[in-house]
């Protein structure tokens, strides 16, 4: 195991675990264990089942609908996972996002409209994301 592999921790959100498994296989690392729950009232819970202290944490989570989550739930799960990693003393947290929800809302087309893509980026930064890595999952599978 290389030094990079020792200091790296890779986790999957609920939306695209298959992609996370492919990335883990390609990097020759194991996916970390994180407990993710969605309560009956819609609230999301995340708890790392292993230490991430001092690790460079990579969270694979598409911000789109899938696996019983809508785009907003997927984003909230990512933010909660980031916050949990930061509070558990991760050295850095990178969001690996295969689909960046709200990316099309990147400019104002009319007065009094939000720039929601910027808001999502600001939310990720506020939660503690150090890096955002966007990938095209179709291209990713073709690169292999």
Task: Please give the residue ranges for each predicted region.
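Positively charged, low-complexity intrinsically disordered leader regions
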Residues: 5, 9-26, 36-41
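Residues at the starts of beta-strands that form the adenosine-phosphate
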Residues: 7, 56, 91-93, 130-131
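Residue-level signature of catalytic and energy-coupling elements of molecular machines
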Residues: 23, 95, 136
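Active-site-flanking structural segment that lines cofactor/substrate pockets
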Residues: 35-71, 75, 79
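Glycine-rich anion/phosphate-binding loops
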Residues: 66-84, 109-122
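Short, ordered loop/turn segments at secondary-structure junctions
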Residues: 98-100, 137-138
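A glycine-rich helix N-cap at a beta->alpha junction
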Residues: 119-134
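Conserved small/polar residues in nucleotide/adenosyl-binding loops
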Residues: 141-144
């Amino acid at each position: 195991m290389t030094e990079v592999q020792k200091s790296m921790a890779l986790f999957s959100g609920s939306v695209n675990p298959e992609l996370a498994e492919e990335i883990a296989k390609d990097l020759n690392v194991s996916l970390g264990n994180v407990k993710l729950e969605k309560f009956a009232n819609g609230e999301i819970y995340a708890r790392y089942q292993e230490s991430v202290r001092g690790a460079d944490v990579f969270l694979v989570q598409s911000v789109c609908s899938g696996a019983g989550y809508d785009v907003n739930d997927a984003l909230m799960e990512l933010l909660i996972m980031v916050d949990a990693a930061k509070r558990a003393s991760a050295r850095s947290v990178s969001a690996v996002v295969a689909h960046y929800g709200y990316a099309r809302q990147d400019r104002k087309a009319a007065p009094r409209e939000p720039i929601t893509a910027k808001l999502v980026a600001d939310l990720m930064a506020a939660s503690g994301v150090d890096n955002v890595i966007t990938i095209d999952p179709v291209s990713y599978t073709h690169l292999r």
